[in-house]
UniProtKB/Swiss-Prot annotation:
Active site as annotated: D239 (proton acceptor)
Record flagged with keyword Lyase: yes
Enzyme class: lyase
Protein name listed in UniProt: Anhydromevalonate phosphate decarboxylase
Associated pathway: Isoprenoid biosynthesis; isopentenyl diphosphate biosynthesis via mevalonate pathway
Binding site for Mn(2+): N130, E193
Disulfide pairings: none
GO MF assignments: carboxy-lyase activity; metal ion binding
GO cellular component: cytoplasm
Length: 418
């Protein structure tokens, strides 16, 4: 795993993978942490490799303010991977999850959860490969239950069900942050996320031939099949809102092989509801929102799903306002692009969308409630929103915190130009 972080915190105290490691990780919300002594296991644990925008930007060689454009560029111009290797650098055995220090995070969790596992599968009809992160609950040493939401892998699974044939998969854990980021991107179903990763890597990405799949050189790779006939209860699990998600009946994964790197392997555990969880789930939605807003307001500068909004429910959008009404058009475009978005605030380019205090300043000095507040009741929202109705509907709010073009001189920020 290639980690570009000079400030790694190493914990040498012996800790249990049940609750104790997670408790320790919560002390370091924005640090990269290695737990070197996990009770009963040989493998150390690493966490926090993607828990700040700065780390993510560094992994794809750009500034924080350029992340959205970098993702758009790589997604629109993927580079087909043409470099491959094998498992000669790995120890290959029969699958045995008891050898991996998989974490139990919180008291009411359904059990031990793999949280940084990227699942690779091929469309049973077209053969196109997909990569996506999924939480997976451990049932025993060879079985997992996977939470599958209605996206690409779900489509593949439905096709496999119709064919009556279990879906072959590989699960990669512990990889280059740029590859991990690529696996979270929202791209068309006929695109391959590893080609996006290859664009991040300037065409230099090497993958492993794993049966019919092509997977990154992760520290741990599991092989198996998603059963089209077996299910089990999945949950509870603490989701990015720091609240428990519900228990659902989900498909079972039956594992066959396990490959662990010979040279210094780590188990990557993402702390549920931590910043790494929030950023990897939310940040890749920002390009989609940006594109939608750009269609309505071509002078959009940036879009941020804020940490206070769990990187999912709240967006801050900066625009170079040209006409009255641009702010509200940006709000409507953002809400339609990301259905889970609950509150959106639009600001001018003299406001730093990465700074919560600056956003609050814009709200305090530029918003007139009866004019600038939009309320949209009875619309579909996020299943993760604790106040959403049982049918998934909620009320959404947009706040136009841009300057009125009629009285620009009143809003000049003296310190901004100094």
């Amino acid at each position: 795993m290639d980690i570009k972080d000079e400030n790694i915190i190493e914990i040498t105290t012996e800790l249990s993978s049940e609750f104790e490691v997670a408790k320790e990780l919560r002390k370091y919300p924005k640090d990269t942490v290695i737990i070197k002594n996990v009770k009963g296991y040989d493998l150390p644990i690493i966490s926090g490799i993607c828990n700040t925008r700065e780390k993510i930007a560094k992994s794809i060689n750009c500034e924080v303010s350029e992340i959205t454009q970098k993702i758009i560029e790589a997604s629109d111009n993927p580079i087909k991977v043409d470099k491959f290797t094998d498992f000669s650098d790995y120890n290959t055995t029969e699958a045995n999850l008891d050898k991996i220090p998989i974490l139990t995070h919180y008291k009411r969790d359904g059990g031990k959860y793999i949280t940084a596992g990227v699942v690779f599968a091929r469309d049973p009809e077209t053969g196109i490969q997909n990569a996506s992160i999924h939480r997976m609950l451990v049932l025993d040493d060879k079985r997992l239950v996977i939470r599958i939401v209605p996206r690409n892998l779900y489509t593949y699974f439905q096709k496999a069900q119709k064919l009556g044939k279990d879906l072959e998969i590989a699960i990669a854990i512990g990889m280059d942050p740029a590859i991990l980021l690529a696996s979270t991107t929202s791209i068309p179903i006929d695109y391959n996320e590893m080609d996006v990763a290859n664009a991040f890597k300037n065409g230099e990405l090497t993958l492993i031939k794993c049966g019919d799949l092509e997977v990154p050189q992760a520290d741990i790779i599991l092989e198996g099949k998603i059963s089209v006939s077996e299910t089990s209860a999945e949950g509870p699990f603490v989701d990015l809102t720091d609240t428990y998600d519900i228990i659902r009946d989900q498909p079972i994964i039956n594992l066959s092989k396990m490959h662990i790197k010979k040279d210094n392997p780590h188990y990557h555990g993402i702390l549920s509801a931590g910043f790494e969880h929030k950023l990897l789930q939310g940040l890749p939605q920002e390009p989609r929102i940006f594109k939608s807003v750009k269609n309505a307001v071509p002078t959009v500068e940036n879009v941020v799903l804020t940490e206070g909004g769990c990187c999912w429910l709240h967006a801050a959008i900066s625009i170079n306002k040209q006409t009255e009404g641009d702010g509200k058009n940006a709000i409507m475009a953002a809400l339609s692009a990301h259905p889970s978005l609950k509150h959106a605030v639009v600001v001018d380019t003299d406001v730093d969308v990465f700074d919560p205090q600056d956003i609050e300043y814009a709200i305090a000095t530029r918003v007139k409630g009866d004019r600038d507040l939009m309320i949209v009741p009875n619309v579909r929202g996020s299943s993760l929103d604790p106040v959403a109705e049982s049918d998934g509907t909620t009320t959404k709010i947009g706040l136009d915190a841009t300057k009125s073009l009629k009285t620009l001189d009143k809003f000049e920020r003296v310190s901004f130009g100094e």
